[in-house]
């Protein structure tokens, strides 16, 4: 379970994928 919202997780993943 993550301590931060799913929105932040998705943004982090996108970013990583985009970059």
Swiss-Prot record:
It is a single-pass membrane protein. GO terms for biological process: oxidative phosphorylation. Its main location: mitochondrion. Pathway: Energy metabolism; oxidative phosphorylation. One of its GO terms (cellular component) is mitochondrial inner membrane. It is found in: Mitochondrion inner membrane. Keywords: Membrane, Mitochondrion, Mitochondrion inner membrane. The keyword Cell membrane does not apply. Component of the cytochrome c oxidase, the last enzyme in the mitochondrial electron transport chain which drives oxidative phosphorylation. The respiratory chain contains 3 multisubunit complexes succinate dehydrogenase (complex II, CII), ubiquinol-cytochrome c oxidoreductase (cytochrome b-c1 complex, complex III, CIII) and cytochrome c oxidase (complex IV, CIV), that cooperate to transfer electrons derived from NADH and succinate to molecular oxygen, creating an electrochemical gradient over the inner membrane that drives transmembrane transport and the ATP synthase. Belongs to the cytochrome c oxidase VIII family. Component of the cytochrome c oxidase (complex IV, CIV), a multisubunit enzyme composed of 14 subunits. The complex is composed of a catalytic core of 3 subunits MT-CO1, MT-CO2 and MT-CO3, encoded in the mitochondrial DNA, and 11 supernumerary subunits COX4I, COX5A, COX5B, COX6A, COX6B, COX6C, COX7A, COX7B, COX7C, COX8 and NDUFA4, which are encoded in the nuclear genome. This is Cytochrome c oxidase subunit 8A, mitochondrial. The lineage of its organism: Eukaryota, Metazoa, Chordata, Craniata, Vertebrata.
């Amino acid at each position: 379970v993550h301590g931060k919202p799913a929105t932040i997780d998705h943004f982090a993943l996108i970013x990583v994928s985009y970059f």
